[in-house]
Amino acid sequence: MEANKSMVKLVAFLIILVSSCFQSLTAQDLEIEVSDGLNVLQVHDVSQSFCPGVTKESWPELLGTPAKFAKQIIQKENPKLTNVETLLNGSAFTEDLRCNRVRLFVNLLDIVVQTPKVG
């Protein structure tokens, strides 16, 4: 009986792991081109920004990339974003607006699976 419980837990873990792999593959299939790694992308019209001094509010090009890499890109593009946090996709989080925060929603492999946004 003990062995069956362990086997069920192992199978459940493997299902979660495999499903998170497929989620990251679909994000990588978007054909987003990141040339040499740490290129800075600029937004020319900052009048639409809801946060003063923030020049870019979202990074769709970071879908499918490792969280550590995404954090480096975001902080290089805008040093005012001092709070770049990583959350497992589906985790609970507060919905308050903070102009210094970007949340990276990742899968179990630490791959970004949602577009990172300021807030």
Curated annotation (Swiss-Prot):
Molecular function per GO: serine-type endopeptidase inhibitor activity
Any one of the GO BP annotations: response to wounding
Alphabetical UniProt keywords: Protease inhibitor, Secreted, Serine protease inhibitor, Signal
Entry's Gene Ontology cellular component terms: extracellular region
Marked site positions, Reactive bond: E95, D96
Principal place of residence: secreted
Classification via InterPro entries: Prot_inh_pot1, Prot_inh_pot1_sf
Cysteine disulfide partners in this protein: none
Compartments in which it is found: Secreted
Signal peptide segment: 1-27
Propeptide: 28-48
Entry's family note: Belongs to the protease inhibitor I13 (potato type I serine protease inhibitor) family.
Name of the molecule in the record: Ethylene-responsive proteinase inhibitor 1
Origin species: Solanum lycopersicum (Tomato)
